[in-house]
Amino acid sequence: MELEAKTGYKFQNFDLLINAMTHSSYANEHRISYVGNNERLEFLGDAVLELTSSEFLFEKYSQMPEGELTKKRASIVCEPTLALCARELSLGEYLLLGKGEEATGGRRRDSIVSDAMEALIGAVYLDGGFANAKEFVQKFILNDIENKQLFYDSKTTLQEIVQGRYEEDVRYVLLKEEGPDHNKSFYMQALLGEKVLGEGCGHTKKAAEQQAAYCAIKKLKNDKGDLCI
């Protein structure tokens, strides 16, 4: 399967991969038993992700207090960050969705693709053990961690960057919206005065604003990794 090629992990029990990609809406429509959807695997994957990310942060930030480690872990395992990681694998393309979820843009919904990402971690764990699951998490979630942490609350981070340097706050402007009411896409712009800092798209205005802020932060980084405006 193409997804196996993307992840570099070959399933011994291919049914686990199918299970991980089966949304409850599809299982309900096709009268598949509860254990046939990905919710139980999501539960398991969540635990594997938390342990792996905790160990990673514990080793990477050896002098950091518990409270700060907890905040950093939250920024890694939160829905927006997992959805970002899922999109890097185009995970939404491989989901089995019910007709209703399909029609309302489920393949692009953060909650659905982030849950599928956790289910996939759970499937790798059951199929290949903790070592393989840990390697998967390190490769697709803990990579480029500094940028992914910025995504956790990009609007707050961006505001903190400009605070104290400028009298104006960052503001967000709706550029356009597309699609039917049940599946809209919003396009937002982050501005400082009249200067465009970044643009973003999402299924809600809030999500689009976060994306715009995230793009702005990445754009404001110079080659040395310092933030500058």
Predicted stretch roles:
Residues 1-229:
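Double-stranded RNA-binding/processing signature
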